[in-house]
């Protein structure tokens, strides 16, 4: 259709299918198998489902972006054979700068298995060359779980502390504060700092590759779950392949 500046990914679609609520298109799909496209964007969460959830509180650039989606699609589908646009298989898709990538859901599991085979192969080679030791491999759990546990705990209890310090936050209908983006940025920076510190303290340069194995293993486990239960997020296997390239 020649849409400019597409921004989307199939994870959004998979999560949408898991939600209990429907959209305006649901009745058309269920009653007449009539296909459609949902447009959605998220920002200024504090306006969502409030009296301020109107066009006056939307960014003009965001509305213009929706128009850039709508007009080419109207032109395309008004001239298309609608009997030939029925999809036979869902696809994984995501945006990267200057292009839009997609591939069938059926590729997700094989891509995960292939990544797993390469992971085991590199692990075997590293053990054979005495680059890896089981002792150091398992010690890699210390900075990994330490970073996850401390960052997760500080984020959870930090937010609880903010709710205690500012009880008026509990009155917000959607739970997103007016300075919510600042809180998100602060907690992200805090989490990254904790991660860097944990690996600085517990992962000496000579054993970094050993500790890297556990990070890749966790990513492999996550992608195994994704391949089975959240296929739309299948593109998250791609960072694993880059990790394997560095690993190899």
List each language-model region with its residue ranges.
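Alpha-helical transmembrane segments of integral membrane proteins
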Residues: 117-248
């Amino acid at each position: 259709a020649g849409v400019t500046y597409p921004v989307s990914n199939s994870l959004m679609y998979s999560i949408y299918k898991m939600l209990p609520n429907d959209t305006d298109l649901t009745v058309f799909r269920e009653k007449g198998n009539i296909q459609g496209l949902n447009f959605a964007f998220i920002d200024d969460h504090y306006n969502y489902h409030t009296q301020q959830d109107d066009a006056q509180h939307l960014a003009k650039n965001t509305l213009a972006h929706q128009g850039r989606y709508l007009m080419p699609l109207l032109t395309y589908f008004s001239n298309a054979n609608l009997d030939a646009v029925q999809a036979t298989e869902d696809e994984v898709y995501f945006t990267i700068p200057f292009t839009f990538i997609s591939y069938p859901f059926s590729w997700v599991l094989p891509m995960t298995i292939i990544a797993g085979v390469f992971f085991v192969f590199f692990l075997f080679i590293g053990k054979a060359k005495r680059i890896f030791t089981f002792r150091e491999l398992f010690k890699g759990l210390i900075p990994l779980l330490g970073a996850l546990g401390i960052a997760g705990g500080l984020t959870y209890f930090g937010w609880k502390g903010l709710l205690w310090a500012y009880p008026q936050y509990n009155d917000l209908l959607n739970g997103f504060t007016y300075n919510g983006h600042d809180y998100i940025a602060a907690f992200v920076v805090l989490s990254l700092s904790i991660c860097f510190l944990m690996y600085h303290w517990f992962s000496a340069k000579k054993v970094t590759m050993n500790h890297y194995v556990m990070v890749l293993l966790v990513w492999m486990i996550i992608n195994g779950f994704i391949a089975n239960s959240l296929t739309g997020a299948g593109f998250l296997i791609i960072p694993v392949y880059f990790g394997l390239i560095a690993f190899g």
